[in-house]
Protein backbone atom coordinates (compact mmCIF):
# COMPACT_ATOMS: atom_id res chain seq x y z
CA UNK A 1 0.00 0.00 0.00
CA UNK A 2 1.41 3.38 -1.01
CA UNK A 3 1.53 6.38 1.28
CA UNK A 4 -1.24 8.94 0.73
CA UNK A 5 -0.45 12.00 -1.36
CA UNK A 6 -1.72 15.39 -0.20
CA UNK A 7 0.84 17.45 -2.10
CA UNK A 8 -1.75 19.02 -4.41
CA UNK A 9 -4.71 19.03 -2.04
CA UNK A 10 -6.07 22.45 -1.00
CA UNK A 11 -5.30 23.23 2.61
CA UNK A 12 -9.02 23.51 3.27
CA UNK A 13 -9.33 19.80 2.47
CA UNK A 14 -6.68 18.80 5.00
CA UNK A 15 -8.04 18.54 8.55
CA UNK A 16 -6.57 20.91 11.11
CA UNK A 17 -4.44 19.12 13.67
CA UNK A 18 -4.20 20.08 17.31
CA UNK A 19 -0.63 18.86 17.52
CA UNK A 20 1.98 20.39 19.80
CA UNK A 21 4.73 19.02 17.58
CA UNK A 22 3.59 20.95 14.49
CA UNK A 23 3.59 24.66 13.65
CA UNK A 24 2.75 27.10 10.86
CA UNK A 25 6.20 28.66 11.30
CA UNK A 26 8.15 27.99 8.06
CA UNK A 27 11.32 27.60 10.18
CA UNK A 28 9.79 24.78 12.24
CA UNK A 29 11.70 21.47 11.77
CA UNK A 30 8.68 19.60 10.34
CA UNK A 31 8.20 22.28 7.68
CA UNK A 32 11.90 22.60 6.89
CA UNK A 33 12.24 18.87 6.32
CA UNK A 34 9.50 19.02 3.68
CA UNK A 35 11.10 22.05 2.01
CA UNK A 36 14.55 20.48 1.94
CA UNK A 37 13.31 17.11 0.74
CA UNK A 38 11.79 18.81 -2.30
CA UNK A 39 15.08 20.58 -3.00
CA UNK A 40 17.08 17.39 -2.51
CA UNK A 41 14.70 15.47 -4.77
CA UNK A 42 15.32 18.00 -7.55
CA UNK A 43 19.06 17.34 -7.10
CA UNK A 44 18.51 13.56 -7.48
CA UNK A 45 19.68 12.97 -3.91
CA UNK A 46 16.50 11.41 -2.48
CA UNK A 47 14.72 9.81 -5.44
CA UNK A 48 12.65 6.63 -5.30
CA UNK A 49 11.89 7.13 -1.56
CA UNK A 50 15.62 6.79 -0.82
CA UNK A 51 17.64 8.88 1.60
CA UNK A 52 16.37 10.79 4.60
CA UNK A 53 16.71 13.87 6.75
CA UNK A 54 16.26 14.72 10.40
CA UNK A 55 16.42 18.00 12.32
CA UNK A 56 16.88 18.60 16.02
CA UNK A 57 14.76 21.46 17.34
CA UNK A 58 17.82 23.39 18.57
CA UNK A 59 15.97 26.73 18.61
CA UNK A 60 12.78 25.41 20.20
CA UNK A 61 11.74 24.99 23.81
CA UNK A 62 13.07 21.44 23.86
CA UNK A 63 16.29 21.03 21.85
CA UNK A 64 16.20 17.29 22.50
CA UNK A 65 13.27 16.84 20.11
CA UNK A 66 14.38 15.23 16.85
CA UNK A 67 12.10 15.35 13.79
CA UNK A 68 12.61 12.54 11.29
CA UNK A 69 11.07 11.90 7.88
CA UNK A 70 9.37 8.48 7.67
CA UNK A 71 10.61 5.45 5.75
CA UNK A 72 9.41 4.54 2.27
CA UNK A 73 7.85 7.92 1.47
CA UNK A 74 8.30 9.86 -1.76
CA UNK A 75 10.34 12.72 -0.38
CA UNK A 76 9.06 15.38 -2.80
CA UNK A 77 5.49 14.75 -1.56
CA UNK A 78 6.26 14.79 2.15
CA UNK A 79 3.93 16.71 4.48
CA UNK A 80 4.73 18.10 7.97
CA UNK A 81 2.18 15.87 9.72
CA UNK A 82 4.00 12.79 8.41
CA UNK A 83 6.98 13.34 10.72
CA UNK A 84 8.12 11.11 13.53
CA UNK A 85 9.40 12.86 16.66
CA UNK A 86 11.97 11.23 18.94
CA UNK A 87 13.30 12.41 22.30
CA UNK A 88 17.09 12.42 22.08
CA UNK A 89 17.29 11.53 25.78
CA UNK A 90 16.48 7.85 25.82
CA UNK A 91 15.51 7.90 22.13
CA UNK A 92 11.83 7.58 23.04
CA UNK A 93 9.27 7.89 20.24
CA UNK A 94 7.03 10.85 21.10
CA UNK A 95 5.00 11.26 17.93
CA UNK A 96 4.01 9.07 15.00
CA UNK A 97 1.93 10.04 11.95
CA UNK A 98 -0.12 6.89 12.54
CA UNK A 99 -1.89 8.85 15.30
CA UNK A 100 -3.31 11.29 12.75
CA UNK A 101 -6.90 11.05 11.46
CA UNK A 102 -7.63 8.41 8.85
CA UNK A 103 -8.61 11.25 6.52
CA UNK A 104 -4.89 11.94 6.31
CA UNK A 105 -3.28 8.53 6.68
CA UNK A 106 -5.77 6.66 4.44
CA UNK A 107 -5.01 3.66 6.71
CA UNK A 108 -1.38 3.65 5.58
CA UNK A 109 0.96 2.41 8.33
CA UNK A 110 3.96 4.70 8.56
CA UNK A 111 7.31 3.30 9.61
CA UNK A 112 10.14 5.20 11.31
CA UNK A 113 13.12 5.85 9.07
CA UNK A 114 15.62 3.00 8.96
CA UNK A 115 18.23 5.77 9.29
CA UNK A 116 17.03 6.65 12.81
CA UNK A 117 19.84 4.92 14.78
CA UNK A 118 22.44 6.47 12.50
CA UNK A 119 20.92 9.92 12.86
CA UNK A 120 20.90 9.48 16.63
CA UNK A 121 24.58 8.55 16.56
CA UNK A 122 25.38 11.88 14.87
CA UNK A 123 23.34 13.79 17.45
CA UNK A 124 24.81 12.07 20.50
CA UNK A 125 28.41 11.83 19.31
CA UNK A 126 28.70 15.20 17.52
CA UNK A 127 25.94 17.30 19.10
CA UNK A 128 24.62 17.86 15.58
CA UNK A 129 21.61 20.02 14.85
CA UNK A 130 20.65 18.19 11.66
CA UNK A 131 21.66 15.08 9.75
CA UNK A 132 21.17 14.42 6.05
CA UNK A 133 21.39 11.08 4.25
CA UNK A 134 21.41 11.07 0.45
CA UNK A 135 21.85 8.51 -2.29
CA UNK A 136 23.96 10.95 -4.29
CA UNK A 137 25.31 9.30 -7.45
CA UNK A 138 28.57 11.21 -7.03
CA UNK A 139 28.97 9.81 -3.52
CA UNK A 140 28.32 6.27 -4.74
CA UNK A 141 30.70 6.66 -7.69
CA UNK A 142 33.50 7.92 -5.47
CA UNK A 143 33.23 4.87 -3.22
CA UNK A 144 33.51 2.68 -6.33
CA UNK A 145 36.34 4.57 -8.02
CA UNK A 146 38.34 4.52 -4.78
CA UNK A 147 38.25 0.71 -4.84
CA UNK A 148 38.82 -0.87 -1.45
CA UNK A 149 40.22 2.30 0.12
CA UNK A 150 38.65 3.36 3.41
CA UNK A 151 39.19 7.10 2.87
CA UNK A 152 38.18 9.60 0.20
CA UNK A 153 40.68 12.45 -0.20
CA UNK A 154 40.76 15.69 -2.17
CA UNK A 155 42.78 18.90 -1.82
CA UNK A 156 43.49 22.28 -3.40
CA UNK A 157 39.90 22.93 -4.50
CA UNK A 158 38.28 26.28 -3.65
CA UNK A 159 34.96 24.72 -2.55
CA UNK A 160 36.73 23.09 0.41
CA UNK A 161 36.47 26.49 2.13
CA UNK A 162 32.74 25.87 2.71
CA UNK A 163 33.58 23.08 5.17
CA UNK A 164 34.49 23.50 8.84
CA UNK A 165 37.91 22.94 10.37
CA UNK A 166 37.28 20.69 13.37
CA UNK A 167 39.49 19.35 16.12
CA UNK A 168 39.12 17.31 19.27
CA UNK A 169 39.41 19.27 22.53
CA UNK A 170 41.17 16.68 24.67
CA UNK A 171 40.31 18.45 27.93
CA UNK A 172 36.55 18.31 27.23
CA UNK A 173 36.52 15.35 24.80
CA UNK A 174 34.34 17.46 22.49
CA UNK A 175 34.75 18.28 18.82
CA UNK A 176 35.16 22.02 18.32
CA UNK A 177 35.02 24.20 15.22
CA UNK A 178 38.21 26.25 14.97
CA UNK A 179 37.48 27.91 11.64
CA UNK A 180 36.97 26.90 8.03
CA UNK A 181 39.06 24.62 5.85
CA UNK A 182 41.41 26.40 3.48
CA UNK A 183 42.23 25.94 -0.18
CA UNK A 184 45.43 24.00 0.50
CA UNK A 185 43.87 21.69 3.11
CA UNK A 186 43.20 18.03 2.41
CA UNK A 187 39.65 16.85 2.96
CA UNK A 188 39.39 13.29 4.25
CA UNK A 189 36.06 11.44 4.47
CA UNK A 190 35.91 7.89 5.86
CA UNK A 191 34.29 5.17 3.75
CA UNK A 192 32.41 2.33 5.44
CA UNK A 193 31.05 -0.82 3.84
CA UNK A 194 27.36 -1.15 3.07
CA UNK A 195 25.11 -3.70 4.78
CA UNK A 196 21.83 -5.35 3.72
CA UNK A 197 19.91 -3.34 6.31
CA UNK A 198 20.43 0.36 7.05
CA UNK A 199 20.40 0.01 10.85
CA UNK A 200 23.28 -2.50 10.61
CA UNK A 201 25.53 0.39 9.53
CA UNK A 202 25.30 1.96 13.00
CA UNK A 203 28.42 0.39 14.54
CA UNK A 204 30.58 1.20 11.50
CA UNK A 205 29.28 4.77 11.38
CA UNK A 206 30.01 5.27 15.07
CA UNK A 207 33.52 3.89 14.65
CA UNK A 208 34.17 6.26 11.73
CA UNK A 209 32.90 9.23 13.75
CA UNK A 210 35.23 8.31 16.61
CA UNK A 211 38.25 7.74 14.38
CA UNK A 212 37.79 10.87 12.25
CA UNK A 213 37.15 13.82 14.59
CA UNK A 214 37.67 16.26 11.71
CA UNK A 215 34.90 14.92 9.49
CA UNK A 216 31.32 16.09 9.03
CA UNK A 217 30.42 13.16 6.80
CA UNK A 218 30.73 9.42 6.29
CA UNK A 219 30.52 7.73 2.89
CA UNK A 220 28.83 4.34 2.57
CA UNK A 221 30.17 2.23 -0.28
CA UNK A 222 27.67 1.58 -3.08
CA UNK A 223 25.03 3.40 -1.04
CA UNK A 224 25.46 7.13 -0.37
CA UNK A 225 26.58 9.57 2.30
CA UNK A 226 25.65 10.83 5.78
CA UNK A 227 26.31 14.52 6.47
CA UNK A 228 25.68 16.49 9.65
CA UNK A 229 26.09 20.05 10.92
CA UNK A 230 25.57 22.20 13.98
CA UNK A 231 22.21 23.35 12.58
CA UNK A 232 20.09 22.54 9.56
CA UNK A 233 21.53 25.31 7.38
CA UNK A 234 25.12 24.33 8.11
CA UNK A 235 24.27 20.71 7.34
CA UNK A 236 22.70 21.83 4.04
CA UNK A 237 25.78 23.87 3.10
CA UNK A 238 28.14 21.04 4.02
CA UNK A 239 26.09 18.55 2.01
CA UNK A 240 26.04 20.81 -1.05
CA UNK A 241 29.77 21.53 -0.83
CA UNK A 242 30.61 17.87 -0.37
CA UNK A 243 28.47 16.81 -3.32
CA UNK A 244 30.22 19.41 -5.48
CA UNK A 245 33.61 18.03 -4.41
CA UNK A 246 32.54 14.42 -4.91
CA UNK A 247 31.20 15.15 -8.41
CA UNK A 248 34.41 16.96 -9.28
CA UNK A 249 36.49 14.09 -7.89
CA UNK A 250 34.65 11.60 -10.11
CA UNK A 251 35.46 13.72 -13.18
CA UNK A 252 39.10 14.14 -12.09
CA UNK A 253 39.50 10.43 -11.44
CA UNK A 254 37.98 9.37 -14.76
CA UNK A 255 40.24 11.89 -16.52
CA UNK A 256 43.27 10.26 -14.90
CA UNK A 257 43.95 13.19 -12.56
CA UNK A 258 44.96 12.93 -8.91
CA UNK A 259 42.48 14.46 -6.48
CA UNK A 260 45.25 15.29 -4.01
CA UNK A 261 48.08 17.54 -5.13
CA UNK A 262 51.45 15.93 -4.53
Swiss-Prot record:
<dbReference type="GO" id="GO:0005737">
    <property type="term" value="C:cytoplasm"/>
</dbReference>
<keyword id="KW-0486">Methionine biosynthesis</keyword>
<protein>
    <recommendedName>
        <fullName>Methylthioribulose-1-phosphate dehydratase</fullName>
        <ecNumber>4.2.1.109</ecNumber>
    </recommendedName>
</protein>
<feature type="binding site">
    <location>
        <position position="135"/>
    </location>
    <ligand>
        <name>Zn(2+)</name>
    </ligand>
</feature>
<feature type="binding site">
    <location>
        <position position="115"/>
    </location>
    <ligand>
        <name>substrate</name>
    </ligand>
</feature>
<dbReference type="InterPro" id="IPR001303">
    <property type="entry name" value="Aldolase_II/adducin_N"/>
</dbReference>
<dbReference type="GO" id="GO:0019509">
    <property type="term" value="P:L-methionine salvage from methylthioadenosine"/>
</dbReference>
<dbReference type="InterPro" id="IPR027514">
    <property type="entry name" value="Salvage_MtnB_euk"/>
</dbReference>
<feature type="binding site">
    <location>
        <position position="133"/>
    </location>
    <ligand>
        <name>Zn(2+)</name>
    </ligand>
</feature>
<comment type="pathway">
    <text>Amino-acid biosynthesis; L-methionine biosynthesis via salvage pathway; L-methionine from S-methyl-5-thio-alpha-D-ribose 1-phosphate: step 2/6.</text>
</comment>
<feature type="binding site">
    <location>
        <position position="223"/>
    </location>
    <ligand>
        <name>Zn(2+)</name>
    </ligand>
</feature>
<keyword id="KW-0479">Metal-binding</keyword>
<feature type="active site" description="Proton donor/acceptor">
    <location>
        <position position="158"/>
    </location>
</feature>
<dbReference type="GO" id="GO:0046570">
    <property type="term" value="F:methylthioribulose 1-phosphate dehydratase activity"/>
</dbReference>
<keyword id="KW-0963">Cytoplasm</keyword>
<dbReference type="InterPro" id="IPR036409">
    <property type="entry name" value="Aldolase_II/adducin_N_sf"/>
</dbReference>
<keyword id="KW-0028">Amino-acid biosynthesis</keyword>
<dbReference type="Pfam" id="PF00596">
    <property type="entry name" value="Aldolase_II"/>
</dbReference>
<keyword id="KW-0456">Lyase</keyword>
<dbReference type="InterPro" id="IPR017714">
    <property type="entry name" value="MethylthioRu-1-P_deHdtase_MtnB"/>
</dbReference>
<dbReference type="GO" id="GO:0008270">
    <property type="term" value="F:zinc ion binding"/>
</dbReference>
<keyword id="KW-0862">Zinc</keyword>
<comment type="function">
    <text>Catalyzes the dehydration of methylthioribulose-1-phosphate (MTRu-1-P) into 2,3-diketo-5-methylthiopentyl-1-phosphate (DK-MTP-1-P).</text>
</comment>
<comment type="similarity">
    <text>Belongs to the aldolase class II family. MtnB subfamily.</text>
</comment>
Amino acid sequence: MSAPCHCSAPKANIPALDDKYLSDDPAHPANLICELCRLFYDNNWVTGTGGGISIRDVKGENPNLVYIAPSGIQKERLQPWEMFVVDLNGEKLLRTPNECPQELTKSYKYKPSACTPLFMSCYTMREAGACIHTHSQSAVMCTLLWGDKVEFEISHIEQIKALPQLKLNESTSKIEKVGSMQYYDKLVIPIIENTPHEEDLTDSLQEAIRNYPGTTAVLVRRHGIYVWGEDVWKAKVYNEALDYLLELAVKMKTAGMDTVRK
